[in-house]
Amino acid sequence: MVKWLYQLFIELTNHAWTSKCLASFTRSKWSRLFISSYAKVYKINKEEMEKKLHEYETLQQLFVRTLKKGLRPIDTHPDSVVSPVDAVIEDVGIITDQKEIIVKGKTYSIREMLGDDQIAEKYLHGTFIILYLSPSHYHRIHSPICGEVVKQWELGGKSYPVNRLGLKYGKAPLSKNYRRITELYTNGMYTAIVKVGAMFVNSIELTHEHDHVKKGEEIGYFSFGSTVVLLFEKDVFTLDEQIVPPFEVKMGQRIGFLAQKKKSQ
């Protein structure tokens, strides 16, 4: 019953015009009146922001704010994988024989998430990591590894919330929400970065246009709280032993290691 009511509420309120109205408002000069209260409610760390709070002219500018230089050092170990975002690692697990992952008791299809069965096949029995960004988090997305950009594509339409309620009661938000996907190739290994849009504000902007990315390099940003899903192939990723979900991480912080060479299957 709770699940049905939750989904009904989302369906009644989550329409294209709702998203457009909200996006338009957050970019308007009137939204500036809400910046101070927004920062207070979500406990935004003003000491980290590149600008003073009063210098942001719209809520949108605050959402996509940059940070002071040097506040997010990138782990320097050559084989490390770093967090692409400031977030909470909500779940880590293994992709099943059916190309599925289980998050908060809900099953998600990797094939549906990626929109391509051949691409999904690469990640069979690999590792997935779910990173949730709240509205208070720094919203810019960075590359977790160095690599060649193989492909970038987008899927999905309207979006359910991607917080804990959304993951539990929503209609498979990780595989149905609007999402933009980047696949990287490093030393014979593939990694997928799935950027999942949040309810009402589907905006995911890409800021990297080159064929190669460095670890920690900015690749895009969300316009509101959202989620990143990382997918690794079988036997190529080892989780850092200190990470036990739910676990708060900062962008650039080491979350694990990539194998130096992919094992032969």
Curated annotation (Swiss-Prot):
Keywords: Cell membrane, Decarboxylase, Lipid biosynthesis, Lipid metabolism, Lyase, Membrane, Phospholipid biosynthesis, Phospholipid metabolism, Pyruvate, Zymogen
Catalysed reactions, semicolon-separated: a 1,2-diacyl-sn-glycero-3-phospho-L-serine + H(+) = a 1,2-diacyl-sn-glycero-3-phosphoethanolamine + CO2
Annotated pathway: Phospholipid metabolism; phosphatidylethanolamine biosynthesis; phosphatidylethanolamine from CDP-diacylglycerol: step 2/2
Annotated cofactor note: Binds 1 pyruvoyl group covalently per subunit.
InterPro entries according to UniProt: PS_Dcarbxylase, PSD-B, PSD_type1_pro
E.C. no: 4.1.1.65
Membrane-crossing residue ranges in chain numbering: none
GO biological process: phosphatidylethanolamine biosynthetic process
Active-site residues annotated for this sequence: 86 (charge relay system), 142 (charge relay system), 226 (charge relay system), 226 (schiff-base intermediate with substrate)
Enzyme class, broadest EC rank: lyase
Modification Pyruvic acid (Ser) occurs at: 226
Location(s), subcellular: Cell membrane
Oligomer status and interactors: Heterodimer of a large membrane-associated beta subunit and a small pyruvoyl-containing alpha subunit.
Protein name (record): Phosphatidylserine decarboxylase proenzyme
Species the sequence originates in: Anoxybacillus flavithermus (strain DSM 21510 / WK1)
Lineage: Bacteria, Bacillati, Bacillota, Bacilli, Bacillales
Gene: psd
